[in-house]
Amino acid sequence: MPGKQFPLKEYIAALAKFLDTIEYQDDNFSHEQRVESLRYVYQHTAKHFDQPIEKAAVTVSPKRLQAVMRTSTLVTVYCWVKCPLDVMVGVSIYFAYIIMLDDSSDTPTTEMKTFCEDLIKGRPQKHLFWQRMNAHLTNFLRYYDGFCAITIFRSTLDFFQGCWIEQNNFGGFPGSSYFPHFLRRLNGLGGISSATLFPRSEFDEGTVFEEIVTAIAQIEPQLTLCNDLISFYKEYDSPRDQINLVSNLAHCNGVSWEIAFEELTRDTILYCEQLVTVFKGKDPKVEATVRAFVHGYVTWHLCDPRFRMQEVYEQAGQSEADLKFRHFYEQATSIGVIDFKLWASPSRLSSDKRKHEQAFGDDPQNGKTRVLESIGQANASEAVALAPLA
């Protein structure tokens, strides 16, 4: 909505109510645990993309790849708190591929003509994304039982189609009231983000099947709505971000952006309330996993500079809602803002890797039970968006 004054008062009130609803308090890690987890996941993500076959396939610049890996590492460590480290690495690699797909601008019509036939007959895919993603999923899905694995693959297909639609810069026809939600569900990655929380090493899918299915159902809308609410400030006056849920709701339903924003706020709080209450009295490990994910997801948003939350914080006044938002923001940044040099500095990579090998050898179980003394390869300053969190 370029040219119009941003509704700061209403926006801060919505954020404060949202954060209050989920009772935001990220106690997932100590500072040392967070830094060490970032080091481990980043270093192993970088190791994956340093393989010759990946180097040949990646089309982005080295600087861009470093930024992509930093982002995938951050969101994974902050949100997949209860997962073993080897699972975190798999999630981080997955999101790196997703970010690079989201960066692309070429419509995949030609390469996708035989996608279904190739998939059914087990032939190699023609699209580069699917070649590399399928190779990764072949290993990554081994961490999961059947229902979660299918959900992860289905969510990947959905995201690809969502990108395909957005590459055509299409936000829906007027009168197509469900289209904005349809598109947001496709590109929201809610399925992958929820199903990957439940690896078979931590959960028996058969025992907590109902809880897992409910988590997938509830996290899908909550994930995207939370992102859309927090992103509203940065997208408000950005010409390149005008194809978003609020603008699509206004366009398709023939209403003002104010009404569309009210709908976004109402739905965000509704689904957050449900997510907070629905697991009470259910399996405690599932409840703790979902809670850790939701609170870590908020921390990542509040601390990532690209969402410009510091600007909102600096403009906040002294009303009850403003003070509440300021409190939550200060709480998040006190734990979530960490200098990249502490975990993604190239100067420390070799020495830390040697320390890790001397301390733990190559036993993979150590990687699941203790954060290893290792660190990433890059400290690029380039910002990057993660599609479902953009």
From Swiss-Prot:
GO molecular function: metal ion binding; trichodiene synthase activity
Pfam families: TRI5
Pathway: Secondary metabolite biosynthesis; terpenoid biosynthesis
Catalyses which reaction(s): (2E,6E)-farnesyl diphosphate = (1R,4R,5S)-acoradiene + diphosphate
Motif D(D/E)XX(D/E) motif, chain ranges: 102-106
EC number: 4.2.3.-
Record: residues binding Mg(2+) 2: N227, S231, E235
GO BP annotations listed: sesquiterpenoid biosynthetic process
Binding site for Mg(2+) 3: D241, I243
Bound cofactor: record note: Some of the cofactor binding sites show unusual localization within the protein.
Cofactor: Mg(2+)
Binding, Mg(2+) 1: D102, E166
Motif placement: WxxxxxRY motif: 316-323
Transmembrane segments: none
InterPro entries hit by this protein: Isoprenoid_synthase_dom_sf (IPR008949), TRI5_ascomyc (IPR010458), Trichodiene_synth (IPR024652)
Keywords carried by this UniProt record: Lyase, Magnesium, Metal-binding
Short motif (NSE motif): ranges: 225-235
Function: Terpene cyclase; part of the gene cluster that mediates the biosynthesis of flavunoidine, an alkaloidal terpenoid with a tetracyclic cage-like core connected to dimethylcadaverine via a C-N bond and acylated with 5,5-dimethyl-L-pipecolate. The tetracyclic core is synthesized by the terpene cyclase flvE and the cytochrome P450 monooxygenase flvD.
Record family assignment: Belongs to the trichodiene synthase family.
Domain observations: The conserved active-site motif D(D/E)XX(D/E) is required for coordinating the divalent metal ions that stabilize the PPI moiety of the substrate.
The protein's name in its UniProt record: Terpene cyclase flvE
Lineage: Eukaryota, Fungi, Dikarya, Ascomycota, Pezizomycotina
